[in-house]
């Protein structure tokens, strides 16, 4: 009996449905950490940014990612995912690095970081949006906002690059 229970658990763990659940859980955890990070980076942009565009983008990031995080937390709860309550260590380190900058340097590095970050986020969210669960539904609902953030970051990045 013990052998058959073990075999059943091994088969379950190897099943595509179990793998999809694990991928969705991982996605949600990363999304929640990312949302916390974006809220904090948005606040930082409002404090340390020089241009009105960077400050306005920071406000948008804080507002949009705070709202998105509530939806991500709801999706995590519905899937039984233990949600993180803060950005991850790498995100905190990036925030701390950026917190030491001000003015044009902050604006330039912030815009570059946001382009790279949102480009990766868009790829991750588009992949997850193909899933037919709460994580996929959450991802689908965020793609337009992420695209808007990506486009705005690119615009700010090109302005900062050309104004050197």
What residues fall within each predicted segment?
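His/Met- and acidic-residue-enriched segments that coordinate or traffic transition-metal cofactors
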Residues: 2-164
């Amino acid at each position: 009996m013990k052998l058959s229970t073990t075999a059943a658990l091994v088969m379950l763990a190897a099943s595509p449905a179990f793998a999809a659940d694990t991928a969705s859980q991982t996605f949600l955890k990363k999304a929640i950490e990312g949302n916390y990070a974006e809220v904090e980076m948005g606040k930082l942009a409002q404090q340390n940014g020089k241009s009105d565009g960077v400050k306005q983008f920071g406000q948008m990031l804080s507002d949009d990612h705070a709202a998105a995080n509530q939806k991500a937390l709801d999706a995590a709860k519905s899937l039984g995912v233990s949600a993180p309550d803060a950005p991850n260590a790498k995100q905190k380190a990036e925030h701390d690095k950026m917190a030491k900058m001000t003015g044009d340097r902050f604006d330039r590095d912030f815009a570059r970081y946001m382009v790279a970050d949102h480009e990766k986020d868009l790829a991750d969210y588009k992949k997850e949006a193909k899933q037919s669960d709460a994580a996929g539904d959450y991802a689908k609902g965020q793609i337009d906002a992420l695209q808007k953030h990506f486009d705005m970051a690119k615009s700010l990045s090109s302005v900062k690059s050309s104004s050197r």
